[in-house]
Amino acid sequence: MAGKDRILILGPTGAIGRHIVWASVKAGNPTFVLVRNTPGSNNRVNLVKAANPETKEELIESFKNSGVNLIQGDMNDHESLVNAIKQVDVVICAFGRLLIEDQLKIIAAIKEAGNVKRFFPSEFGLDVDRHDSVDPVREVFEEKARIRRIIEAEGIPYTYLCCHAFTGYFLRNLAQIDITVPPRDKVFILGDGNVKGAFVTEADVGTLTIEAANDPNALNKTVHIRLPKNYLTINEIISLWENKIGKTLEKTYVSEEKVLKDIKEASFPNNYLLALYHSQQIKGDAVYEIDTAKDLEASEAYPNVEYTTVDEYLNQFV
């Protein structure tokens, strides 16, 4: 019986990448990460303060102790990238929004290596082929869609992973700006609060990504993570929270017109976060029918995966 595929994670120390690494190790896949000989700059402004306390150095040491294979290399060194890719079967990219175009370097290296069974480009959000978002989010989605088209044109085997709303961005503050825990007095709700959204923890994204990587049925498909107990409206989530704290929050409903105005007037990261919230809570970009010829619903494809529900996730803040 053949062993499990060897998996390379690019961007392994990010908010999602680390969870993919840990899930790969747990699943028994030989796991590889690309690490730079010299540290890169980190002067960018993050969307939210990471809930993950580990430094990159601590993560790399943790990976090493877990049996992860560390490959020295650099995204800007084509030869080292090709060398890394030749050692594996599956390549998973978990780059942030500022590095989407850098995936062109990965695509070129995959083409030269000629051995990759599957490439997961950096998606991990809403479906970039099904959305009605506004800038600055739309610009990022269009970049990701362009990467999809290049992958397809080059004939590279792929899986696209659409996980919608991370709990770290959307749930730990009930999609409120400038706070890091759920509010206990008042809450702002975009639109009428009755549009379904899909929520998932970063750890569960890691688990489901590796499930898809080990699933031949996910080849050249888009995997959609819309877990049944986490497919909720913001009103339903607020009701769950109110029941936990035994208090009714003061609710202010914000019109789409006002949200769009706020997006234009806000600076980063608030304009980006508001555009994400607008996409899911007002435009309903997590509400659609899948095409079984090219899509998989994760909860149906991997029914044995136990996941953290929204209800369970909120317990830590009570």
Swiss-Prot record:
TM region positions: none
Q: Name one Pfam family in it.
A: NmrA
Establish whether keyword Nucleotidyltransferase is in the entry.
Answer: no
Which BP terms in the Gene Ontology apply to this protein? Answer: defense response; lignan biosynthetic process
User: So where does NADP(+) get bound?
Assistant: G11, P12, T13, G14, A15, I16, G17, R36, R44, R148
What is annotated as the active site? Answer: K144
Q: Which UniProt keywords apply?
A: NADP, Oxidoreductase, Plant defense
**CDD domains from the entry?**
PCBER_SDR_a (cd05259)
What catalytic activity is recorded?
(3R)-vestitone + NADP(+) = 2'-hydroxyformononetin + NADPH + 2 H(+)
Per the UniProt entry, the Enzyme Commission number(s) are: 1.3.1.45
Recorded GO MF terms: 2'-hydroxyisoflavone reductase activity
Superkingdom of origin organism: Eukaryota
SUPFAM superfamilies named in the record:
NAD(P)-binding Rossmann-fold domains (SSF51735)
The record's function comment reads: Reduces achiral isoflavones to chiral isoflavanones during the biosynthesis of chiral pterocarpan phytoalexins. The reduction product is a third isomer, which represents the penultimate intermediate in the synthesis of the phytoalexin (-)-medicarpin, the major phytoalexin in soybean.
What protein name does the entry list?
Isoflavone reductase
Species assigned in the record: Glycine max
The gene coding this protein: IFR
